[in-house]
């Protein structure tokens, strides 16, 4: 999992990316291409 400053640009890289908030942190998850996992904060 990558830690990034801006998740909005990462989310646009694949159409199956989802932006999720868990425990005060923002995550990008992707069930199809798991290599797009990232978090912020």
From Swiss-Prot:
Cellular component annotations (GO), alphabetically ordered: ribonucleoprotein complex; ribosome
InterPro entries with a match to the protein in the record: Ribosomal_bL36, Ribosomal_bL36_sp, Ribosomal_L36_bact
Alphabetical UniProt keywords: Ribonucleoprotein, Ribosomal protein
Transmembrane segments: none
PROSITE patterns cross-referenced by the UniProt entry: RIBOSOMAL_L36
Biological processes per GO annotation: translation
GO molecular-function term, one example from the UniProt record: structural constituent of ribosome
Name of one Pfam family that matches: Ribosomal_L36
Entry keyword annotation includes Membrane: no
Assigned protein family: Belongs to the bacterial ribosomal protein bL36 family.
NCBIfam families reported in the protein's UniProt record: PRK00831.1 (NF002021), rpmJ_bact (TIGR01022)
The protein's name in its UniProt record: Large ribosomal subunit protein bL36
Organism: Rhodopseudomonas palustris (strain HaA2)
